[in-house]
From Swiss-Prot:
Reaction(s) catalysed by this chain's protein: 7-aminomethyl-7-carbaguanine + guanosine(34) in tRNA = 7-aminomethyl-7-carbaguanosine(34) in tRNA + guanine
Cofactor note: Binds 1 zinc ion per subunit.
Residues forming the catalytic site: D89 (proton acceptor), D264 (nucleophile)
Enzyme kind, highest EC tier: transferase
Record gene name: tgt
Protein name: Queuine tRNA-ribosyltransferase
Biological pathway: tRNA modification; tRNA-queuosine biosynthesis
Keyword Zinc applies: yes
Organism of derivation: Buchnera aphidicola subsp. Acyrthosiphon pisum (strain 5A)
Length: 370
C-alpha cells in the first residue's frame, strides 16, 4: 500500500491509497462488515453506494466461520466476493467488551469466548496470523482497550501494554513477508501526555499508518475534538490517520477538519435498520406516521437506488411490516449519503473551499427538524 497526500486545505487533507492498482481516495469512510458482510446488502450493492474499502473484524471471523472455512476460499475477499481492499480490526476492543471473563497478562488475553464459552488465549502473534490468513490489506495491531474515564495510572498501564504488543505485532507481521500494511494504534485515553508517549513510541517502531483508538467510547465530543487537535499534527504527514469507530456525519466533518484521513462506523447501517435515514437537512425517522402518505423520495438531491425508485410512504410501510426489504433499501440510502458526503468533502479540499462547505453543511443540517 502506498499513500500520498495530494491536496491540503488548512489541516484538511485529500490523498490516495494505492493497493496494487486499486486507487482509493481519502478522506474515506469504510462501511463495517463485521462478519464478512455489511448487514442486509450484497457486495455489489455496497460498491454501488460508492464504497471502495470495507472493515471486517478478525476476532469475530476467527470464531465464526473460522479460518479453516475462509481459507478454503483462499481469503476473506473470495469468501465474501469483495474485490476491493479490506481493513481488519484485530479484536482488541471485542475481547474487552464482549467477554464475561477476561484476564490480561504481558503476553495476551485469556477470555471466555462468546460463541461456546470456552477459554481462549489471544496474543499479538495469533492476531497477526489470523489477519494474515484472512488476506487483510490493512492489518491492525493487537491492543488493549479500556473504558473511558479510567484514572491516569490504569490508562498508563494499558497504553504501555499496547506499546509492548505493538512491537510484538510488528515482529510477527514482518515474519509473514506479505505486502499488506500494518497500522499502529495510539492510546492514552483522555490524557494528552500519554497520547504523546504512545505516538512517539509507535513512530519509532514505524507503521504504515496510525489509528486513534479509545475514542467515541463515552467521552464528550469536545474532549474527542481536543485530542484530535492535539495529536493529529504530531502524526507523520506522509502516513494516513485513522479515527476508529467514528462516526456521525458531523464527526466526519470535524475529523477531516483536524487532518483525519480514514473513518469507520456502524452508524449508517445500524441507523438504517432502525428507520433513521440521513438526508441533506438532517435525519428522517421513517417510522413517524406523518410519512404514511408521503409520496416524495427521501432526499430530492440523492441519486441512490432507494431515492430513485421508492417513496417515503413505501419505506414507512416496509418498516411498519418489519419487511427485510426495508432494511436493505434504508442501508443503501444511508451508505450512499455517507459516500456522497465524503466525495463532496474531497472536492471541497481540492478546491480550497472546505470551510465554506462545512458551514453550508451545518446550515442545511439544522434547517428542518424531522
Amino acid at each position: 500500500m502506498n499513500f500520498e497526500v495530494l491536496y491540503q486545505d488548512n489541516n484538511a487533507r485529500c490523498g490516495v491509497f494505492n493497493f496494487n492498482q486499486e486507487i482509493i481516495e481519502t478522506p474515506v469512510f469504510m462501511p463495517v462488515g463485521t462478519y464478512g458482510a455489511v448487514k442486509s446488502i450484497s457486495t455489489e450493492e455496497i460498491k454501488n453506494t460508492g464504497s471502495r474499502i470495507i472493515l471486517s473484524n478478525a476476532f469475530h471471523l476467527y470464531f465464526r466461520p473460522g479460518l479453516e472455512i475462509i481459507k478454503l476460499h483462499g481469503n476473506l475477499h473470495n469468501f465474501m466476493n469483495w474485490s476491493g481492499p479490506i481493513l481488519t480490526d484485530s479484536g482488541g476492543f471485542q475481547v474487552f467488551s464482549l467477554s464475561r471473563f477476561c484476564k490480561v497478562n504481558e503476553e495476551g488475553v485469556i477470555f471466555q469466548n462468546h460463541i461456546d464459552g470456552k477459554k481462549t488465549f489471544l496474543t499479538p502473534k495469533i492476531s497477526m496470523k489470523i489477519q494474515s490468513d484472512l488476506g487483510s490489506n490493512i492489518v491492525m495491531i493487537f491492543d488493549q482497550c479500556i473504558e473511558y474515564n479510567q484514572n491516569w495510572e490504569k490508562t498508563k498501564n494499558a497504553m504501555e501494554r499496547s506499546l509492548y504488543w505493538a512491537k510484538k505485532s510488528r515482529i510477527y507481521f514482518d515474519s509473514y513477508k506479505n505486502k499488506n500494511s500494518l497500522f499502529g494504534i495510539i492510546h492514552g485515553g483522555i490524557y494528552p501526555s500519554l497520547r504523546d508517549i504512545s505516538l512517539q513510541e509507535l513512530i519509532k517502531i514505524d507503521f504504515d499508518g496510525y489509528a486513534l483508538g479509545g475514542l467515541a467510547v463515552g467521552e464528550p465530543k469536545i474532549e474527542m475534538y481536543k485530542l484530535l487537535d492535539h495529536i493529529c499534527p504530531q502524526i507523520p504527514k506522509n502516513k494516513p490517520r485513522y479515527l476508529m469507530g467514528v462516526g456521525k456525519p458531523e464527526d466526519l466533518i470535524e475529523g477531516v477538519r483536524r487532518g483525519v484521513d480514514m473513518f469507520d462506523c456502524v452508524i449508517p447501517t445500524r441507523n438504517a435498520r432502525n428507520g433513521h435515514l440521513f438526508v441533506t437537512n438532517g435525519v428522517i425517522k421513517i417510522r413517524n406516521k406523518k410519512y404514511k402518505k408521503d409520496l416524495s423520495c427521501l432526499d430530492k438531491t440523492c441519486v441512490c437506488y432507494t431515492c430513485r425508485y421508492y417513496s417515503r410512504s413505501y419505506l414507512h410501510h416496509l418498516d411498519a411490516c418489519n419487511e427485510i426489504l426495508g432494511a436493505r433499501l434504508n442501508t443503501i440510502h444511508n451508505l450512499h449519503y455517507y459516500q456522497t458526503l465524503m466525495s463532496n468533502i474531497r472536492n471541497s479540499i481540492k478546491n480550497n473551499t472546505f470551510e465554506q462547505f462545512s458551514l453550508n453543511f451545518y446550515k442545511q443540517k439544522n434547517k428542518i427538524d424531522f
